[in-house]
């Protein structure tokens, strides 16, 4: 997921004319070069993976103290607003960006569940092991409402389209169905 997000974000944030046309189609907005971007994950390890993947494109770098940071040219828009933020759901509370990538992280071949999940008799515990933070309605709400124009969820569509997903995280399944119905699943 991190590499997919990095490639798309790099294309969009460094847009040429063909990408600008594509972004205009997505956002219905002519002011594409001034778009802001957010990358949200439920897990800090995935945030670091996204930073690392974006380093290849010159969008992120390591600071002198070893922490990750966004390269200067991608930090702010001309009007001073934040251009790019990468972080966990909690870092996005109260924030909005034109385009948000939501990295779901969770994936599982439902036919090959590990024994500790497959043998779990309590449905709620099984769901928690499979979906983790996705089951937090507050976090899911924050993660799926930070975009002004485009929400691009990156994850395992098959996993999101299972009965256990529908039972555990109905909002995610409903969103998947909406995207499928509107023809915007990539």
Q: What does each of the following model-derived ranges do?
A:
Residues 66-100, 107, 121:
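Conserved motor-coupling elements within RecA-like helicase/translocase cores
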Residues 44-47, 91-93, 106-110, 148-149, ...:
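Conserved nucleotide-binding/hydrolysis micro-motifs of P-loop NTPases
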Residues 29, 111-186:
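Helicase C-terminal subdomain and adjacent C-terminal extension
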Residues 32-36, 80-83, 95-98, 145-148:
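Short, well-ordered loop/turn elements at secondary-structure boundaries
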């Amino acid at each position: 997921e991190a590499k997919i997000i990095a490639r798309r974000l790099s294309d969009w944030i460094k847009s040429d004319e063909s990408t600008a046309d594509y972004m205009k189609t997505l956002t219905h907005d002519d002011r594409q070069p001034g778009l802001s971007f957010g990358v949200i994950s439920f897990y800090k390890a995935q945030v670091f993976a996204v930073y690392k993947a974006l380093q290849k494109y010159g969008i992120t770098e390591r600071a002198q103290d070893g922490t990750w940071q966004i390269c200067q040219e991608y930090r702010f828009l001309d009007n001073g607003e934040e251009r790019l933020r990468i972080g966990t759901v909690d870092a996005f509370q109260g924030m909005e960006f034109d385009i948000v990538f939501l990295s779901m992280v969770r994936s599982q071949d439902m036919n090959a569940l590990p024994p500790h999940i497959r043998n779990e008799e309590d449905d709620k515990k099984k769901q928690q092991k499979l979906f983790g933070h996705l089951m937090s309605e507050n976090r899911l709400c924050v993660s799926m409402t930070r975009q002004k124009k485009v929400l691009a969820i990156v994850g395992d569509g098959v996993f999101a389209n299972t009965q256990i997903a529908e039972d555990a995280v109905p909002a995610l399944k409903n969103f998947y169905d909406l995207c499928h119905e509107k023809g915007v699943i990539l």
